[in-house]
Amino acid sequence: MEWTDDGIVLGVRRHGESSAIVELLTRTHGRHLGLVRGGAGSRMRPLLQPGNSVSALWRARLDEHLGTYALEGTRMRAASLLASSHATYGVTHLAALARLLPERDPHEVIFAMLERTLDDFDRAGGAAIHLIRFELAMLSELGFGLDLSACAATGATGDLIYVSPKSGGAVSRQAGEPWRDRLLPLPPFLRVTHDEQDGWSEQDLLDGFELTGRFLLRHVLEPRGQGHSDARAGFINAVVRKRTAAIADGARVMAELNPPST
């Protein structure tokens, strides 16, 4: 048995003296493990870092065997990801999310989304929006998707600003007004009418993580006896710190450009 596929490194663990078991999310073969001979050595270490993209050749005598990987790097992102705190936490959390997928089942939509997310992870705010959308996609892929396309109460498709914490359906401003204290905010960047040129606030990001986090806990993590990864909280805190620092820097620059008159 053998196949070739594109993959993204999710994790690696030492096996024996010199080998390693590498976990990939592959484009057409899903989350898949394999043995890399010499994978524990210093020569292979830069390649086998979470977030890197590889071309993978997998071989095994039988399909159900662990098999071996021969890997070649196609996009080496790890160095840039490790250069910033939000990206370091983010790639760890993304790998933890991908591990929720059944092994060896194809999830091409999730693979493509993970690839796009990792390719645009430099800016903390943009990375946060990507990660929230990835969590939303994971809910859908695991069978617990939220319907944010129309109001759950009226069927209207405009002015959707809330989400029902029970059904996971969007709710319009008018229909949700009497119960707004019980509803979850729907961040602008998750609305069907969102324009990518529109801005966002720190609170929008926190609302997004609250929304996806609540449903991930209820439907996916708690039934497995799990909670959110520590990396998720670390990512959110790193993004907030960078946002706060950027605002402070902007205020300082404005003060320098417009000194008080004497």
Curated annotation (Swiss-Prot):
Coiled coil: none annotated. Gene3D superfamilies: Nucleic acid-binding proteins, Recombination protein O, C-terminal domain. Keywords: DNA damage, DNA recombination, DNA repair. GO terms for cellular component: bacterial nucleoid. InterPro entries: ARFGAP/RecO, DNA_rep/recomb_RecO_N, NA-bd_OB-fold, RecO, RecO_C. NCBIfam families: reco. HAMAP family: RecO (MF_00201). Belongs to the RecO family. Involved in DNA repair and RecF pathway recombination. This is DNA repair protein RecO. It comes from Nitrobacter winogradskyi (strain ATCC 25391 / DSM 10237 / CIP 104748 / NCIMB 11846 / Nb-255). The lineage of its organism: Bacteria, Pseudomonadati, Pseudomonadota, Alphaproteobacteria, Hyphomicrobiales.
